[in-house]
Amino acid sequence: MMGKKLAVDDWTINDILELYVSNGLFVDQKYQRKLVWSLSDKELFIDSLIKKFPIPNIMMVEYNENEKITYGIIEGLQRINAIISFMLEEFPIVVNGKSGYFDITATPSTFDLQQEGKLIQKEPVLDKQICIDFRGYKLPIISTSHDTKTIDEIFKRLNSTGTKLSKHDLRQAGALNKFSQLVREISSTVRGSKTLSDIVTLETMPKISLSNSGLDYGINIENVFWRKHGILTEDLLRKSRDEEIIAILLGAFLLDRPIAVISISVLDNLYDANTEDGKIADDKLVKCYDNIKTLFIQIFNELDLIYDETDISISEMLFASDRKKTDIFMLFFKVMLQEHFECKAIGDYQDFADTLKNSKGSILNKFEEKTSSDYLTENNTVRLISDIIGSHLVEVESYNPLVNEVVSRLNLASIETKYTEYKIGFTYFHSPSKYRYNEGRLNFKNVSQIAKVASAMTNIKRDSKNPGMIIVGVADNESGYK
C-alpha cells in the first residue's frame, strides 16, 4: 500500500476506460449498491459531460499489490458505469439534435476491442471530434490510500446529505460487523446476486445488478423473490427495502424481541458492534453464524418451492389488499422461523397454500385490531398464523446447508468460474446410434477429467471460506435424463 494521501486528481475519461479494460477497476460491495441508474439517468449524465458541465467528485481507494496498481470505487459507481456503458456502445446519445453511438475509433482501447472482435460499432455514429473531446473530459477523482476506518468516515460524510442513498443503504454501507455481513449475504442470496467475495471487478457489476428498463443486463427484477411474490414494488426493491426487512427479521430473532419494537434506532444499534444490541447480536453470531444463515435461506427457498409447486404466490396467500404487506409478511416469516428452528417443514404445499389463501381475511382482520398494543397485536397474529399452518407441518431431519451453497454457485455460473466447475454427469447419454451400447454406462473419461479438475483446484490460492466445488448434474427422472 502506498503512503497515505487524499487528493483530487484530474483523470480523463480515457484514463478510466483504460483502467476498466485492463481489469484495474474494482467495486467494494460494502460501500456500493448494485447498478440502479435507468437509461434516462445515464443519458442525462453523458449529456452533461459532452456539454462539459461540472460533476461531483468520484472517490477511489488505491491499492498497490504485487507492483500492480488497481483502484476500488468507493463513491461514483453509477457515473463511472454510465461512462463505460456509453463508450462500449450500450446506448446512443443525442447531440445537436442527432442521435448517435460513440465512435470506437476515437480511443485506442475501444479500437483494440473492435480489432479483437469484442466490440462492434453501432449506427449511426457520432461525429468523431465529439467523441475525442468526450474522452478528454477531466473527471474530479479523489484517490486515497487511507485505512478502512478513515474511508468509512469519508464515505458516510459524502452521503450524509441529499438523497444519494436510502437510510438503510447508508446504514449498511461500510458496516463491518457480523450482523451487517449476514444481512448482506442473506439479501444477495435471496436476490440472486451473491458473489464469493465482496470485491468484484466493475465488469461484473451489470451481471449481478437488477435489470432496468432499456438496459440489457443483469438479473430480471420480475423474477426476484420480492417481486415474484408481490411483496415489494420495484422502487422499494431498488431502495434496498428487502435488506431492511431482513435486518428487522434477523434483529428480532437475535435479540429475541417482537418485530414491532425493532425501531430505526434499534437497527442503527445492531449495525454498531459497540452498542449493547450490537454486541448481543454479534456475540450470538460468533457461535451460530452459519446455522442462522442456513435457517433464513432455507425458508426463502421453501417459499419459492411452494410457488413452483402450486403457482400461488405469497401475495395471493397472505395479502387481502396492499395494506401492511411487509408487516404481515414479516409476521408470517417469524412463524416459519419458529417452526423451522424446531425442525418442522411443510408436508403438503398445495393444501398449505390453499389454507392460507382461504384464511388471509381473518389474518388481516386480526392484525388490524388496534384495541391493544402493537406487541399484543403481533402476538395474536403470530398465534393465529401458527394455528392455521400447524396441521400442515411435519417433523424433518436437519437441513443440509450444502443445498444453499449449490444454488448460490449455480446462480454465479456466468461470473464465478475459478472456484466452481460444472459437469453434466458421470455417464454416457444421447450417444450416436453406433455407440448406443454406452448409454447409461459410466464415462471414465469424464470421471478422469473431474479428478484432474479437483487436483487443480487444490493449487488455486483462495479464501478458506470459499472452497472449490465441482457440481455434477443428476436427472430427477427419466424424462429429465432424456
Predicted regions and their residues:
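Short, flexible beta-strand-to-coil junctions
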Residues: 61-66, 145-148, 252-257, 341-344, ...
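Basic- and aromatic-enriched surface patches that contact anionic nucleotides/nucleic acids
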Residues: 2-14, 28-251
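Polyanionic (Asp/Glu-rich) segments that form extended negatively charged tracts
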Residues: 192-339
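Conserved N-terminal catalytic/coupling substructures associated with nucleotide/phosphate chemistry
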Residues: 130, 135, 274-482
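Active-site-adjacent bridging/hinge elements
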Residues: 17-22, 51-60, 216-226, 413-433, ...
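N-terminal extension/subdomain marker
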Residues: 1-20, 369-383
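Short, cationic low-complexity segments
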Residues: 163-182, 272-281, 361-367
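Intrinsically disordered or highly flexible coil/loop and linker segments, enriched in small
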Residues: 54-55, 163-167, 192, 196, ...
